[in-house]
Amino acid sequence: MPQLDVDKTIEELRLGEKIDLVSGIDFWHTASVPRLNIPSLRMSDGPNGVRGTRFFNGVPAACFPCATALGATWDTELLHKVGHLMGEEAIAKGAHVILGPTINTQRSPLGGRGFESFAEDGVLAGHLAGYCSKGIQEKGVAACLKHFVCNDQEHERLAVDSIVTDRATREIYLLPFQIAMRICKTATVMTAYNKINGTHVSENKKYITDILRKEWGWDGLVMSDWFGTYSCTSESIIAGLDIEMPGKTRWRGDALAHAVSSNKVHEFVLDERVRNVLNLVNYVEPLGIPENAEEKVLNRPEDQALLRRAAAESIVLLKNEDNILPFNKEKSIAVIGPNAKIAAYCGGGSASLDAYYTITPFEGVSAQSKGEVHFAQGSYSYKDLPLIGHLLKTDDGKTGFKFRVYDEPASSSNRELLHELHLVSSQGFLMDYRHPKIKSYLYYVDMEGYFTPEESGVYDFGVVVVGTGKLLVDDEVVVDNTKNQRLGSAFFGNGTVEEKGSKELMAGQKYKITFQFGTAPTSDIDTRGVVIFGPGGFRFGAARRQTQEELISKAVEVASKADQVVVFAGLTSEWETEGYDRPDMDLPPGSDELISKILEVKPNAAIVIQSGTPVTMPWAPKAKALLQAWFGGNECGNGIADVLYGNVNPSGKLPLTFPVRLQDNPSYLNFRSERGRVLYGEDIYVGYRYYEKAQLPPLFPFGHGLSYTTFTREKLELNTSPEKDKLQDGEPITARVTVTNTGKVAGAETVQLWVVPPPTEVNRPVRELKGFAKVHLEPGESKDVEIVVEKKLATSWWDEKREAWASEKGVYWVQVTGTGEGVLTAEFEVKKTRFWTGL
């Protein structure tokens, strides 16, 4: 299809067609105008993989490590390659736009979507997002930076008013967007759900038009977050929101037609919104993706290798006393813990997807160990009972269960079977499930499979629904979640609290499991303040009841007999998810006790934590070997095993500060919405800026990470260009330092460049990260590393009186740090205070 002549097309469009173009037609597609050859475009989540068009029963995809994991690599070259693969995955899914990267700032360790963003620091987050976006767009696919801006919590996210100073907005929350845009001007940007200082961002001219378009010179398409449009006329259209997502429209359509006819919205303003839609069509047109393209899979060996590399390079070696790691492959090993035999490969919400495959830590370790491998559960990490679908069999012997859709409930004697599927996962979000015979969101589903337990005992069963549900064992109701329902956190905050029941089962006996589900309209639960996604969703699980004491006792016994021990603990997509902020930083119940007991009998045990954001570690002082392994994507288990056994030398550095306790974090008194507002009381002191200013030592600082080798840094040279009368864009500060691998194994070092400001008119952080570079070195090898930063970006703070950046005169110190102790310093001078705006 040829490129559109945008001006001519706008002239030829009828008013109704223009209005159609500025809102989606369904969950993932824009409108088409066939008579003018304007195609429909497809969008897809998301930040750590391209899901395609279906949450429910979708086509599998590559799952990348979560953003904080990628942030821990501090590797722009790797993120560039990740972006390339994301672009190729999008093309395979027939998607023109990837809804990512996410670059909100983790002002609290509790944010439900904290794992979706790269770092607490705008320089690190912005560079990684920029290179990831560049990789995506070099494949012809449009990237989408989100959520613009201050969408930093899930609590009351549609309504909360973020009260934040302009200085903090500029220096902390807008900075990653600004830096990413300097590297790659993404084709699209998504607005945040929240308000800033009284106005929703999706109708906030200051941010969409004045800053993004005028000051930064960006000319792409602005879309709303899903159901994040709150107005029709002057508020969103005039503010610069180009397209409302998803469809069908709530705020445009007939309401917008009336607004144009009454001059509430001038047609030339609508034309500007349409222009940006058509420009996006032209941007992705060379892809040649047909409308309603078939969704395909890639899963190539080279893709698997990249995912494995990313998983391994993201792992942060927090402690390694007595050089306990790497382990010896010839020795026996005990693999213990709640995360050992599950693949905690991604967080929850719009970042979740059905991966091509997953590798658990136990599988990864077992594949590499040449000695005996033993396992003990130790404790469980589930929030709700673990899914049971993969343990069921159909009546014809297939793994999974039958999913039968009816027009009437099970109590009806003459109901019609509308559709039948075979499923394996006992969790389903039906918002994008469609079938020609299903005419509304009201229908009923019977799910049926057979369970044969391996062990006798009391089994607990649990049901979570957006709708209503009953679980039956051999036709006996064990769980009834149809009455007196309580709203919980699952399914973006739409789901009920898990209702439970129990039944004693005998090993080897086959039991029929039936789950009767009614969609969302069958429930009378109060869902004010949350968005209901169509027909709702379901989740049912089960587990044999065991006491924590029994589990730990068995784990201690197994650990005591092995040469080497590794404990896998942490969180999962149940604990870290969109729609829900964590109430605390704690590991799931039982995990801390398990780790402490194992360390008592095996002080040399290695502890591996999987989480997207910080957790408390009361046992950390006793642990000699400790790794942070994040949510590692498809290859999480292999990546962890590669580091444990020394196939890969760990090179990750923390992109987040890990506080000793929740009360230490700077947002502790001001997180969550109170009376519809959240006060960003810590101002610019987010993350390390606060801990260093307050002289409050964290458990592990931002930028920390050890290696199996050692490095030296020396010969710091600092060069600056002669100052002009006017501070020039691109005027550089170039730092050169020699890095040497002084150890016995190859490794990678991240050189971090910090700038310490002189005394200035305003209170400033002790120092701020301004640049970084990663270098790979063989044993004994030296390389000169060069980091170039612009002087104006290295020295400026936001002056609210002048509404401009201020590069204040004075002597600034550069600090260069990396693995281990030692700081190299140098200085440069800014001789004249200057003010500037722009990108």
Curated annotation (Swiss-Prot):
Beta-glucosidases are one of a number of cellulolytic enzymes, and catalyze the last step releasing glucose from the inhibitory cellobiose. Keywords: Carbohydrate metabolism, Cellulose degradation, Glycoprotein, Glycosidase, Hydrolase, Polysaccharide degradation, Secreted. Belongs to the glycosyl hydrolase 3 family. Disulfide bonds: none annotated. One of its GO terms (cellular component) is extracellular region. It is found in: Secreted. Pathway: Glycan metabolism; cellulose degradation. The active site is at D225. Its EC number is 3.2.1.21. It comes from the Eukaryota. One of its GO terms (molecular function) is beta-glucosidase activity. Glycans are attached at N197, N494. One of its GO terms (biological process) is glucan catabolic process. InterPro entries: Cellulose_deg_GH3, Fn3-like, Glyco_hydro_3_AS, Glyco_hydro_3_C, Glyco_hydro_3_C_sf, Glyco_hydro_3_N, Glyco_hydro_3_N_sf, Glycoside_hydrolase_SF. This is Probable beta-glucosidase I. SMART domains: Fn3_like (SM01217), PA14 (SM00758). Residues 396-556 form the PA14 domain. It is an enzyme of class 3 (hydrolase). SUPFAM superfamilies: (Trans)glycosidases, Anthrax protective antigen, Beta-D-glucan exohydrolase, C-terminal domain. It catalyses: Hydrolysis of terminal, non-reducing beta-D-glucosyl residues with release of beta-D-glucose. Its main location: secreted. Pfam families: Fn3-like, Glyco_hydro_3, Glyco_hydro_3_C, PA14.
